[in-house]
A protein has these predicted regions:
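N-terminal acidic, glycine/proline-rich low-complexity segments
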Residues: 1-120
């Protein structure tokens, strides 16, 4: 089993040139995505002109086929009552994504994937 606690997946956020490439794309699917993000962001503190929200699921999907660019450790973990992911030697061991070795490479990969034509 492989998991990505919030500690490592909370970095799945696009900003700067990566985000602007998505935001300014003429792709109909990305335009629809950005239209929906603009609507959603009205009820939040997010500024849709500047950055995405945290894209938690993108890291989980990435981990479904590779652990490249991630620091992985086989360990037992648990979630405390306060919602903190903590090591637990008595818990079932799993491969845990703890950190990134090259976060910018992931951001570039995610940007490239989103800008790629949809395969039908």
């Amino acid at each position: 089993m492989i998991i990505t606690p919030q500690d490592s997946c909370s970095f799945g956020k696009l900003t700067g040139d990566h985000y602007q490439a998505i935001r300014q794309s003429n792709d109909p699917a990305l335009k629809a995505l950005m239209d929906n993000y603009n609507i959603w962001a009205k009820g939040t503190t997010h500024d849709p002109e500047v950055a995405s929200s945290v894209l938690f699921d993108t890291v989980a999907v990435y981990l479904a086929y590779t652990t490249e660019h991630l620091v992985m450790k086989n360990m037992g973990i648990r979630v405390t009552d306060e919602g903190v992911t903590a090591p637990d030697v008595n818990a079932q061991h799993m491969d845990v994504a703890l950190d990134w070795t090259n976060l910018d490479t992931f951001h570039q990969y995610l940007t490239d994937r989103l800008l790629s034509p949809i395969v039908q």
